[in-house]
């Protein structure tokens, strides 16, 4: 088994209809694949958006709301409905699912970070599938672009996953926008994320979600620097999860850093909040940049 512990991330557009409402058929396609991988012995985590999509209709909104308060209210209703769909589908295959709602503060505070990691480890050991989302109802920052892409990368690094798979309706990473540029070429393998790669990513490509290819590239950076390989591939294919798990997906693969950052450096680099200032002389600057320490 090449990748035992896998984090899958599905965005809102991957589990909704064209009108923005939840698609039970798309969710069933995802859970069917998760169940098959679970039976094969994989340890699985699902980071799923979709709470707003699941809830706005129940509150009487005709379309996906725009105002923050309306989104948060929709998420409060929709998170339970979203979990109900996942739980019903997975339990029919004898799989226990667990809901975990996280926010930026859970990563910034080291004790909460360690507690979350401990809970996830127990769930995986007990063969449950944790289903994770941002805490949309109380977190304003979460509703901005990049939420669950970044969250999935942070979770993958936290639990030392063997693979992160970002499922999207935007088909892989190209050198340009394939919808407007017929000469755009798909990038199958990315060994280093540089400024050119970031430029290629562009902006959001979906009307129903909050993230685009650029947020996925940023998420891939976090995971790859932490030693976790990353796939970006289409959620529209019936066996996309299984293909990614076997390293056969028709998508863009990001090669991880050979020696991933240790847990302490991960936390400092990606999760902790910067406060105050530190001034160093030229000698210390050279030692820190070249050797990673000044003593």
UniProtKB/Swiss-Prot annotation:
Signal peptide per UniProt: none
Amino-acid biosynthesis among keywords: yes
Top EC class of this enzyme: transferase
InterPro entries xref list: AceGlu_kinase-like_sf, Asp/Glu/Uridylate_kinase, G5K_ProB, Glu/AcGlu_kinase, Glu_5kinase, Glu_5kinase/COase_Synthase, Glutamate_5-kinase_CS
Family: Belongs to the glutamate 5-kinase family.
Name the UniProt record assigns to this protein: Glutamate 5-kinase
Record-listed E.C. numbers: 2.7.2.11
GO molecular function: ATP binding; glutamate 5-kinase activity
Residues bound to substrate: 49, 136, 148
GO biological process: L-proline biosynthetic process
Keyword tags: Amino-acid biosynthesis, ATP-binding, Cytoplasm, Kinase, Nucleotide-binding, Proline biosynthesis, Transferase
GO cellular component: cytosol
Compartments in which it is found: Cytoplasm
Chain residues that bind ATP: 9, 168-169, 210-216
Record carries keyword Amino-acid biosynthesis: yes
């Amino acid at each position: 088994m090449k990748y035992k512990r896998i984090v899958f991330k599905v965005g809102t557009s991957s589990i909704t209809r064209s009108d923005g409402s939840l698609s039970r058929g798309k969710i069933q396609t995802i859970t069917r694949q998760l169940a098959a991988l679970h039976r094969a012995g994989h340890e699985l985590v699902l980071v799923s958006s979709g709470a707003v999509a699941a809830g706005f209709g129940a509150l009487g909104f005709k379309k996906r709301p725009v105002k923050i308060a309306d989104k948060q209210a929709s998420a409060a209703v929709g998170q339970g409905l979203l979990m109900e769909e996942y739980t019903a589908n997975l339990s029919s295959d004898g799989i226990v699912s667990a809901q975990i709602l996280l926010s930026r503060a859970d990563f910034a505070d080291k004790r909460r970070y360690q507690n979350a990691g401990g809970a996830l480890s127990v769930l995986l050991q007990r063969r449950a599938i944790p289903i994770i989302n941002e805490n949309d109802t109380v977190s304003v920052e979460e509703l901005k672009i990049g939420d669950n892409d970044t969250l999935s990368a942070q979770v993958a690094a936290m639990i030392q996953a063997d693979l992160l798979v970002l499922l999207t309706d935007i088909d892989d990473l190209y050198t340009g926008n394939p919808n407007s540029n017929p000469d755009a070429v798909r990038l199958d393998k990315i060994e280093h994320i540089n400024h050119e790669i970031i430029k290629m990513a562009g902006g959001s490509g979906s009307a129903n979600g909050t993230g685009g290819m650029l947020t996925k590239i940023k998420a891939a950076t976090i995971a790859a620097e932490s030693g976790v390989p990353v796939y970006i591939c289409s959620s529209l294919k019936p066996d996309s999860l299984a293909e990614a798990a076997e390293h056969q997906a028709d998508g863009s693969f990001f090669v991880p850093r050979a020696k991933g950052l240790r847990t302490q450096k991960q936390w400092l680099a990606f999760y902790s909040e910067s406060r105050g200032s530190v001034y160093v002389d030229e000698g210390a600057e050279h030692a820190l940049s070249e050797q990673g320490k000044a003593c």
